[in-house]
Amino acid sequence: MAVESAAVGVFDSGVGGLSVLREIRARLPSESLLYVADNAHVPYGEKSAEYIRERCERIGDFLLEQGAKALVLACNTATAAAAAELRERYPQVPLVAMEPAVKPAAAATRNGRVGVLATTGTLKSARFAALLDRFASDVQVFTQPCPGLVERIEAGDLYGPQTRALLERLLAPILEQGCDTLILGCTHYPFVKPLLAELIPAEMAVIDTGAAVARQLERVLSARALLASGQAATPRFWTSALPEEMERILPILWGSPESVGKLVV
């Protein structure tokens, strides 16, 4: 039986989920946090659904072994591939997952034209198609797969010339269509918001789902009487790649240096 003082386990294909972790920390400062970055297998966006499901199951098992009281799947691609299976596998804990912010974007657009930046895996998924059918039938949606962008962010290059050139190329079709609203459909992408702001019209709305996930986590923990109170424990981090590489980038993306454990699953 999970207890209030147990930690929340958060995982992603890499460091992108840190954007969600920051939102959770801001909204729920009493919650102790566990974070797994599957950097040895990043990006998930070009991999098969079966491969992604296997990785998610291994990481989910690991986080539950660490005593997690809830899981947050901080990856749009993994949500599309594995969320339903993970909920069946872990009925004993709440699982909060990600999906592109199609509903709020459809409500926000003024001219009925919405652009989406996401991974190939997310854009090709049945889950994304269902979101469009359900919430975006009255708007035009222009999707743009973003190969290479996750890798730039994983390298900590949030503002350099290579990342700028890549974003300019990826944004061009969306800007040509006159979209007034942009969905960031990958948890890595909020880290390049400052650069995006230089490349898009000032009036263009940019929507991601990190804050919404933190709110949903608060709701599900409250419903199960699992909200923590008091002082949170120091967050714990693991990576399936080189710990020293993640330790190098954590001050940039998380805001403070942390020690990182090696995940072998």
From Swiss-Prot:
UniProt binding sites for substrate: D12, S13, Y44, G45, N76, T77, T187, H188
The enzyme's E.C. designation: 5.1.1.3
Matching Pfam families: Asp_Glu_race
GO annotation terms (biological process): cell wall organization; peptidoglycan biosynthetic process; regulation of cell shape
Enzyme class: isomerase
Keyword Cell wall biogenesis/degradation: yes
Keyword presence, Transferase: no
InterPro entries (UniProt xref): Asp/Glu/hydantoin_racemase, Asp/Glu_race, Asp/Glu_racemase_AS_1, Asp/Glu_racemase_AS_2, Glu_race
PROSITE patterns, A to Z: ASP_GLU_RACEMASE_1, ASP_GLU_RACEMASE_2
Active site: C75, C186
Pathway(s) of this molecule: Cell wall biogenesis; peptidoglycan biosynthesis
UniProt keyword terms in alphabetical order: Cell shape, Cell wall biogenesis/degradation, Isomerase, Peptidoglycan synthesis
Catalysed reaction equations from the record: L-glutamate = D-glutamate
Known function: Provides the (R)-glutamate required for cell wall biosynthesis.
HAMAP family according to UniProt: Glu_racemase
Protein name (Swiss-Prot/TrEMBL): Glutamate racemase
Source species taxonomy: Bacteria, Pseudomonadati, Pseudomonadota, Gammaproteobacteria, Pseudomonadales
